[in-house]
Swiss-Prot record:
Stated name of the protein: Octanoyltransferase
Localization (cell): Cytoplasm
Keyword presence, Cytoplasm: yes
Gene behind this protein: lipB
Higher taxonomy: Bacteria, Pseudomonadati, Pseudomonadota, Gammaproteobacteria, Pasteurellales
Molecular function via GO: lipoyl(octanoyl) transferase activity
Organism: Histophilus somni (strain 2336)
C-alpha cells in the first residue's frame, strides 16, 4: 500500500446514520497501512445538521428525520438522486505535488472535481471562497462538509443530479437564507443526469487531482 493506493466502494442506497457510524469506525480503527477509500452512496430523505448547525435554519419541520452530525457546516438535505462521495483519506500521510495534503487543499480538490465533472456535461460552475461548495448561476448544486479525526478525513460532498429539490425549501441550505438549489437535471437531459453515469466521472477527476494510480473498485 502506498500514498497513491485507493479503494472505491459503491454502497448503493443506505441509511445515513448507518453509513455515518461506519465512517467513524473506519477512521477510528485505521492505521498507517490502511488504504484511503471513497464511498459512493445515496441516502433516503434526511436532513443533517453540521457541528455548527443552528436550529433556526430548519424552517418548517416535516416528517423527514433530522440527524445531528459531526461534520462541518450547517443543515443540508440528502435524498435519492443525489450522489454522495465520502472521502476517507489519511491527510497527514498523503502527499500532493510533493507537499503534505492539508484540509484546504482537500476541499479545493473536491470542489474542482465537481467543476470538472459538470464541465464534461457542458455545465459551467464555480466554487466560492467564502461559501464552500459548487454553484451554477448563483444556485448551489453541490454541498461540502468534512470532519478531520486523527489527521484523517471523513464525510465529503453531495452533488445534486436528478432529485426532488423541494425539501431544500424547508431549510436555509448550509445556513444561507434564501439560497436556491439546483441540480444537473436542470441543465441536461434526464437520461444523462443519472448517478450511475456521473459518479465515475466524479471519481476519475478526484483521483487524478490527488495522484492516485492504484485504484480498486468494489
Amino acid at each position: 500500500m502506498t500514498d497513491t493506493t485507493l479503494i472505491i466502494r459503491q454502497l448503493g442506497i443506505q441509511d445515513y446514520q448507518q453509513v455515518w457510524q461506519q465512517m467513524r469506525e473506519f477512521t477510528d480503527t485505521r492505521n498507517v497501512l490502511t488504504a484511503d477509500e471513497i464511498w459512493l452512496v445515496q441516502h433516503p430523505a434526511v436532513f443533517t445538521q453540521g457541528q455548527a448547525g443552528k436550529p433556526e435554519h430548519l424552517l418548517n419541520p416535516t416528517d423527514i428525520p433530522v440527524v445531528q452530525s459531526d461534520r462541518g457546516g450547517q443543515i443540508t438535505y440528502h435524498g435519492l438522486g443525489q450522489q454522495i462521495m465520502y472521502v476517507l483519506i489519511d491527510i497527514k500521510r498523503h502527499k500532493a505535488n510533493g507537499s503534505e495534503l492539508n484540509v484546504r487543499q482537500l476541499v479545493t480538490a473536491l470542489e474542482q472535481s465537481v467543476v470538472s465533472t459538470l464541465a464534461d456535461y457542458g455545465i459551467k460552475s464555480y466554487p466560492k471562497a467564502d461559501a464552500p461548495g459548487v454553484y451554477v448561476n448563483e444556485q448551489k448544486i453541490c454541498s461540502l462538509g468534512l470532519r478531520i479525526r486523527k489527521g484523517c478525513s471523513f464525510h465529503g460532498l453531495a452533488l445534486n443530479i436528478n432529485m426532488d429539490l423541494s425539501p431544500f425549501r424547508q431549510i436555509n441550505p448550509c445556513g444561507y437564507i434564501g439560497l436556491e438549489m439546483c441540480q444537473m437535471a436542470d441543465f441536461i437531459p434526464t437520461e444523462q443526469a443519472q448517478c450511475d453515469k456521473v459518479a465515475p466521472k466524479l471519481v476519475t477527476h478526484f483521483t487524478q487531482l490527488l495522484g492516485y494510480n492504484d485504484v480498486t473498485t468494489y
